[in-house]
């Protein structure tokens, strides 16, 4: 990895914002002749045939809904900034969901500002414009275009996103001087928040965050299409993993993680969350993302993974697979119990149902099996009332899905967990049973077995649709599917 050099101060650059400098470059400095040479000889690369983003109509409608909810108030929605990984390297950037949802843009340091007018709001997207060739920023700044790639010009950005664009470097000063009521989405851009520190309140800002979260509870057609794309790529990623299980046995869970990641990067933007590639007793650790354990024949592999599309929509799918292609009798018994619980949960997903219904339906089946197996004393109603099944079921049976894997997290309880399902909602149904390796309350043969089955379910007008139905779920179908992929 190369290192950017330091821009010398000249009369032309002395009053400008300093270029970000990186230390310890091999060149001691920049001669006046080189600095002058780098100013010219560059072709005009302005893009004139840009088309609007595919979701331009949807993002405009979302901004209109936001405007209607907060008339007369200035609204500030930042994308966020790069975060340092180490020294002068950064983590890959992912824009705030609120910003991406309203604009379609994914650029660091971007800010959407909606200025109140007599009939709504005037929208402006603030971005960093093209690198300036005159002051050397494009080649001497570590974030200049020569180092990290070409940016859109402001004119190009307007064409792509359908929003007037301005230079973000002018925004903080303008916000400091602004008057009138204002709300900001917090937690993404400290500089913007500092500029508004005496103009905003936590209570009003939280109302904005909650509203933006609840807007995403019901997905539009574009979002549903993106979620289906994410799921379809995820299915192919699971197929990839099955084909390399023999190689994973020779290495570790990391091989599985890397195999799925390749599919996510080839067909999408990234993985939607840290892949859980949990073999053997690691399947009993709900968020096992270290993925550094062995993969052994005879064990189960719990793979919980999802591809994220280029528009940030993610799948979230789990299958629990026999490493050698066939479940043992006990593994099958536990797996089939989880399958039956998931079937009951999915059947409860329909418009007008309470959000909690699918969780309750799945938990009842699991409690029945635990009583049947003699692992907990019945009757089932007592087990459910006291929550005794939770020693082995551990987690809720699902969550909303969208641009965040756990989507709409800021929504109010009454609209989410205590709410009612509506057509267009997308959620996961993911019951599980987990018998910890050190659980002395169950027979030894159960210990270290963990099973989860998870699918992405769309609420439709007359019921539901399993977006991930292309991946087999029944134990016999899983075995046949694996055999076909392994040849």
Which ranges hold each PLM region?
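Active-site neighborhoods and metal-handling regions in enzymes and metal-associated proteins
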Residues: 1-487
């Amino acid at each position: 990895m190369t290192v950017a050099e330091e821009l010398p101060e000249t009369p032309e650059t002395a009053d400008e914002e300093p270029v970000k400098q990186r230390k310890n470059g091999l060149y001691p400095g920049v001669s006046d002749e080189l600095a002058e040479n780098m100013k010219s000889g560059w072709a005009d690369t302005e893009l004139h045939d840009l088309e609007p983003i595919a979701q331009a109509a949807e993002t405009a409608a979302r901004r209109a809904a936001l405007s209607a909810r907060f008339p007369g108030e200035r609204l500030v929605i930042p994308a966020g900034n790069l975060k340092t990984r180490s020294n002068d390297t950064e983590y890959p950037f992912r824009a705030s969901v609120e910003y991406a949802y309203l604009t379609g843009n994914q650029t660091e340091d971007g800010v959407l500002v909606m200025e109140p007018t007599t009939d709504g709001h005037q929208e402006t997207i603030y971005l960093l414009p093209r690198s300036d060739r005159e002051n050397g920023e494009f080649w001497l700044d570590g974030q200049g275009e020569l180092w990290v790639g070409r940016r859109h010009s402001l004119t190009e950005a307007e064409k792509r996103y359908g929003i007037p664009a301005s230079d973000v470097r002018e925004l903080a000063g303008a916000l400091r001087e602004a008057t009138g009521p204002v709300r900001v989405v917090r937690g993404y851009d400290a500089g913007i928040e500092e500029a508004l520190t005496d103009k905003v309140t936590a209570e009003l800002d939280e109302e904005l965050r909650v509203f933006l979260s609840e807007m995403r509870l019901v997905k539009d057609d574009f979002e549903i299409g993106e979620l289906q794309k994410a799921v379809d790529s995820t299915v192919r990623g699971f197929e990839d993993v099955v084909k390399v299980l023999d190689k994973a046995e020779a290495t570790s869970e990391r091989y599985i993680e890397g195999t799925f990641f390749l599919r996510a990067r080839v067909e999408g933007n990234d993985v939607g969350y840290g892949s859980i590639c949990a073999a053997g007793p690691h399947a009993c650790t709900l968020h096992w993302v270290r993925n550094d354990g062995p993969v052994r024949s005879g064990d189960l592999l719990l793979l919980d993974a999802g591809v994220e599309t280029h528009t940030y929509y993610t799948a979230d799918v789990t299958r629990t697979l026999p490493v050698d292609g066939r479940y043992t009798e006990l593994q099958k018994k536990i797996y089939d119990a989880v399958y039956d619980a998931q079937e009951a949960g999915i059947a409860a997903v329909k418009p007008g149902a309470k959000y909690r219904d699918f969780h309750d339906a799945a938990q009842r089946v699991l409690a029945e099996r635990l009583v049947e197996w003699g692992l907990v004393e019945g009757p089932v109603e007592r087990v459910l009332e006291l929550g005794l099944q939770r020693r082995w079921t551990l987690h809720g049976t699902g969550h909303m899905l969208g641009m965040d894997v756990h989507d709409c997290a800021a929504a109010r309880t009454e609209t989410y967990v205590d709410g009612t399902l509506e057509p267009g909602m997308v959620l996961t149904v993911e019951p599980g049973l987990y018998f910890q390796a050190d659980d002395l309350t169950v027979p030894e043969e159960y210990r270290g077995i963990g099973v989860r089955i998870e699918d992405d379910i769309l609420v439709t007008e007359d019921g539901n649709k399993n977006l991930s139905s292309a991946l087999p779920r029944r134990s016999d179908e899983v075995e046949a599917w694996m055999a076909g992929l392994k040849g």
